[in-house]
């Protein structure tokens, strides 16, 4: 996963998906 400006990448290996969440706190699935 690449870091996007204002976002932190999160890799969930258990569920096998990656999502980014903004520093604001709301999760955004991609």
From Swiss-Prot:
GO cellular component: chloroplast thylakoid lumen
Subcellular location: Plastid, Chloroplast thylakoid lumen
Keywords (A to Z) from UniProt: Chloroplast, Plastid, Thylakoid
Thylakoid in keyword set: yes
Domain of life of the organism encoding this protein: Eukaryota
This protein's name: Thylakoid lumenal 17 kDa protein
């Amino acid at each position: 996963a690449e870091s996007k400006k204002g976002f932190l990448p999160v890799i969930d290996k258990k569920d096998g998906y990656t999502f980014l969440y903004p520093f604001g706190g709301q999760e955004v699935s991609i």
